[in-house]
């Protein structure tokens, strides 16, 4: 009544405590871990966030920022506390969560939109990061689909 749907969902994630769960991961908000001073890694993070639907490899990122692969992986892990692959997965899953919250797209459409082509891999990564399946997440946060 006093705000929009996006703000309501955000507030529900901050204040929701679901006691039936083993994990509260579905409510976590990914902020990108940018509180570091490594310029190349910041640029790589911004590139990943802007191009998450494309196929991004560690080698291509290291080459793009003129850093050796091992050095790039080590610096990325030190700066973000995630490996490059974990970070890419988290960005993709965060985009999928936003899509589930705000659109009527089905699981396959969202999966393709965020750059996954394998349903099982998408479900596995989604559940690992959020603690719930994509269907459960969509049903909980998108009342347009269920209501």
Regions found by a protein language model. Give the residues of each.
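Key DNA-contact positions within bacterial/archaeal DNA-binding proteins
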Residues: 70, 119-120, 135
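Helix-turn-helix
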Residues: 62-67, 115
């Amino acid at each position: 009544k006093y705000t929009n749907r996006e703000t309501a969902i955000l507030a529900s994630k901050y204040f929701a405590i679901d006691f039936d769960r083993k994990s509260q991961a579905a409510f976590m908000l990914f902020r990108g871990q940018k509180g570091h001073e490594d310029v190349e890694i910041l640029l790589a993070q911004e590139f990943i966030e802007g191009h998450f639907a494309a196929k991004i490899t560690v080698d291509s990122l290291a080459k793009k920022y003129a850093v050796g692969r091992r050095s790039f992986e080590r610096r990325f892990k030190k700066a973000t506390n995630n490996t490059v692959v974990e970070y890419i997965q988290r960005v993709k899953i965060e985009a999928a969560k936003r899509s589930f919250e705000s659109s009527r797209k089905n699981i396959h459409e969202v999966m393709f939109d965020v750059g996954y082509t394998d349903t099982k891999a998408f479900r596995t990564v989604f559940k690992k990061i959020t603690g719930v399946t994509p269907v459960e997440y969509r049903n909980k946060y998108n009342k347009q689909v269920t209501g």
